[in-house]
Amino acid sequence: MKKWLPAFLFLSLSGCNDALAANQSTMFYSFNDNIYRPQLSVKVTDIVQFIVDINSASSTATLSYVACNGFTWTHGLYWSEYFAWLVVPKHVSYNGYNIYLELQSRGSFSLDAEDNDNYYLTKGFAWDEANTSGQTCFNIGEKRSLAWSFGGVTLNARLPVDLPKGDYTFPVKFLRGIQRNNYDYIGGRYKIPSSLMKTFPFNGTLNFSIKNTGGCRPSAQSLEINHGDLSINSANNHYAAQTLSVSCDVPTNIRFFLLSNTNPAYSHGQQFSVGLGHGWDSIISINGVDTGETTMRWYRAGTQNLTTGSRLYGESSKIQPGVLSGSATLLMILP
């Protein structure tokens, strides 16, 4: 009997451990902030720096997300951990204009994740906090007054090159909140993933106000390059062009960059091209440069011309008659 006793004890203890259940509930309290910053006088060539300043923000938070997982009440001890979250966007659109935001300083936060749309910043500030029995998960909509001692972050804003002179207020929507996890065991760790947090309502607004004193403007928002009616035998290498003017109030460099909207039928090496259908491509040039990009310099305020050209290309084994159509997008990029 003695030689079986250790095995019997081991199996009994193992069975008891398997029967234990680990419980966790997660809650997220979000703040409804509405922050105003003093208006800044800028030019579109400036990289504008501003702070998502929480000092003047709300202290009342609303429970906006819960994952109780059946763990809503306990009669024994439970343990809590807390994270502060600040999620800020990478771009803001308003009245047809886009500004692009870059994280310049994260302050006391760590950058937990980022995607094409947002920076997800967090700071853990309490772990394994023991609590007596009670409710461990609450109902959506519950309000609490929560302290915030984590500060904010600093962002750089890049303005659209064609933003007209005038006064603008861009609403920067962001998410600020406190995540609380409750466990019926010590040592639990869990952060809400960014893919889930991205779906939360961004109830914070920072009103980014600027007075634009100088920028650059094209004379047209679109160009149509028409090759006219051509014989299939004479269309190859046919060239057509259109010119627009670009006016700048301030000295600057502008990089003009083409993006194809219709895929070409052929490979053209370093030359930029778009597909026109029926076995035809258009090789596009900007001021005579056909690589898809060029830079123009304004040493003083003034107007310069930009000529966009199209040269038809097709191989005899593939070309067909028909209506040819293609398009590209021309970006104006400041340094």
UniProtKB/Swiss-Prot annotation:
Subcellular location: Secreted; Fimbrium
Gene3D superfamilies xrefs: Bacterial adhesin receptor binding domain (2.60.40.1370), Fimbrial-type adhesion domain (2.60.40.1090)
Signal peptide bounds: 1-21
GO terms of molecular function: carbohydrate binding
GO CC terms in record: extracellular region; pilus
UniProt KW keywords: Cell adhesion, Fimbrium, Secreted, Signal
A Pfam family reported for this protein in Swiss-Prot or TrEMBL: PapG_N
GO biological process terms held by the UniProt record: cell adhesion
Primary localisation category: secreted
Entry function: Tip adhesin component of type P pili that binds preferentially to Gal-alpha(1-4)-Gal-containing glycolipids such as globoside. This tip is common in E.coli strains that cause human cystitis, but rare in pyelonephritic isolates.
Similarity comment text for this entry: Belongs to the adhesin PapG family.
Designated name of the protein: Fimbrial adhesin PapGIII
Species per Swiss-Prot/TrEMBL record: Escherichia coli
